């Protein structure tokens, strides 16, 4: 299925009861069970199905499947905001005493989370420059649980060499998490460059209309949690918080995204409403068309600003003189999305 087709159709087949061609809004909190045993099996994760909309919902499930398909992942989790997605992506991996290593070129909300909020939970963030691979390697130790970067930085517009970051992650046996909000999977699919987990603020380009807050975590299914069980015992040992489930046994390659759903989401409740999922699906349908226009418009503005006598510098990776032009060619096909900045 081509990208633009998947953005419209992935994850949904006509509703078997109503034959609805468009994705329905399942505005419900709860679901009926066939009998008590069926209910018990659902809560024990022994069979697939809906339990409670805080954890799962049919409308949200379509959005999750669609975003996962566009990114090339095995599963996704839709959440109330991009910041919820980033927080849960890390809480599913970390505990007090853990650390993460992140690029210092970050969205402001993410920086505040890493620099101020996570330390209050006993999780340290070590910041490095995105192109200093020696510093990145040196910052990793036995308590490191993830590397983190943005494919295209917001608002700096820097482009990270994801392949080189992924090589470092592989050498040390830790997952690479990439915020792909600005690039979107239309320009960049981080899993193809070796990343293991992707996060999104769906609010921005995927939603596209400025009406709806939302976020998502996408799991590549490629990180071997069993191989790295010493660093990540939470995936291969019984979880006492959820009926003793062993994620690698019950969910296989989708162990990580399953834990995101039944631990941080279930326990802290940053759920996306079904109506917001529906609104985000409307925006997602036109992502291909909008990203083409975003890129062409931003490039024209950047080129105009470059010639302006009062502008000393334009930060846009698609410009020939950008220090990120070569990386943008490899990571994003030479395009740099719709965010640019300039100096007077």
Label each region the model flagged:
Residues 33, 132-136, 322-323:
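A short acidic, often aromatic-flanked loop/helix-cap motif at beta-alpha or helix-coil junctions
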Residues 72, 143, 310-313:
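Glycine-centered tight turns that cap/initiate beta-strands
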Residues 313-344:
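Conserved PLP-binding catalytic core of the aspartate aminotransferase-like
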Residues 46, 70-71, 210, 334-336:
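Short glycine-enriched loop/turn motifs at secondary-structure junctions
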